[in-house]
């Protein structure tokens, strides 16, 4: 067969192979969560684990029950809300709070950055083998989050948490939170991002506690939302001192301002 005819005969097969390779290269290896999301409106989701005090019917240990009762005394019948005084929601609170506040995901191969509009709170999930050594991880409200892919599901383990006594699902510094993120579509074709969290904490709970929240795309923006939380912690310290002294637990934010003025 003449050389030119062989080339013409092979050309369609080569073109098909190149096209297939191009499509494969264009397909992402994992789902991309990048975008702004808001609470899914397709179905009721129940109580979230944000601020507002501990939920009822939690499988509490005796120590967990004691801590819950202590916190309820600290916040009083008016149920003081730490979120209203600028304390970070942390994990899982910022992931599971319902309402109109959007949440933004920015995804890179080795990191998922999540920004909650309230307080412009940020958490980072580090994906893959490149991780901070355990001895260098500092406890925080959001903890340290280490992620890996299991197919199309991002699996995350969050540790190094500060005490979350004020959460709807409270936890101690010993808590480990296992999380899962994945995307699907509902019957109407709406894209749905599902967040699942399992709290394992032998101090508070006799068994794991699970949280599920769902999000849908939000056609809007994350807006600036600055706030400082020092006043909240000072108020809580005042009330804790009253509790330990057996005094009425009635400190108010005005008392915090007055104490600050006296120190100046």
What are these regions (language model features)?
Residues 2-14:
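Bacterial N-terminal signal peptides that target proteins for export
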Residues 20-22:
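N-terminal signal peptide c-region/cleavage motif recognized by signal peptidases
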Residues 2, 24-264:
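Hydrophobic small-molecule pocket/channel-lining residues, especially in calycin-type beta-barrels
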